Amino acid sequence: MVVNTEKCIGCGKCTVYCPVRAISVAQRKASIDLDICTECGNCQRAAVCPKDALEKQTLEWPRQIRSQMSDVTTVYRGVNGRGTEEMKTNDITHRFKPGFAGIAVEMGRPQISSSLRDLEKMSRVLAFHGAEFEDLNPITSYIADRKTGTLDPDILDERVISGIVEAAVPIEKLRECVEAVIAASDDIDTVFSLDVISINDEDGGNEARRILDEAGIWYRPNCKNNVGLGHLN
């Protein structure tokens, strides 16, 4: 995003609509810090500029990634949004199978954002511990080597509102993966949420919960549940 300074009157109405605080006003003109801007387009969609001075610029590679990952109206490679439906549609997709656990590392949030370099740190950790990355996740499409989890080096300095690294691991590797992600969190400069996804046993038990409990790893008692209604008409 850029400001057309010939139109801008410096009213500052747009500044509060930037989720990463990239817009500032000085000498009666707004300006956008392009190092921080994630190209989400939120300032323009808010339609608060009385002079229509906020304009989308032509994005070249690798800056295009900012829009692809942060602008909710952008569809890239047939995938829109930060990630998949994860377990919410598992009764239809069968994305997560018995004997496996899903892991999702949700990085960045509005006002904070995340660099692709930090996202790569988590994808490398998961790859090292044998995780298989989700094909339909947009971050996966940027992974240059799935065996190592490394991203295309050209994109590492780009920033996005948020991104999710999605993967699945054999249930017996869950503990080491979770502990490795927690340890790696000391080396990232953003916030993140760690999700664990698993299928209940036939008796209603849950192996993933047992593993986390035995390891003394805290998790929230409330969770998302798939009750299997997706196949009903």
Where are these regions (language model features)?
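Structural signal for hydrophobic packing residues in well-ordered secondary-structure cores
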Residues: 15, 22, 44, 127-130, ...
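Iron-sulfur cluster-binding cysteine motifs and their immediate structural context
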Residues: 2-5, 9, 13-34, 38-62
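Cofactor- and metal-binding active-site motifs of prokaryotic enzymes
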Residues: 150-158
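Short, conserved charged micro-motifs
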Residues: 113-118, 171-180
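Long, contiguous binding/interaction regions
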Residues: 9, 65-99, 124-127, 156, ...
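Flanking helices and flexible, charged tails adjoining ferredoxin-like Fe-S electron-transfer domains
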Residues: 42-137, 143-150
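Short beta-strand-to-loop capping motifs
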Residues: 107-109, 166-171
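Flexible loop/N-cap segments at domain edges
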Residues: 159-163
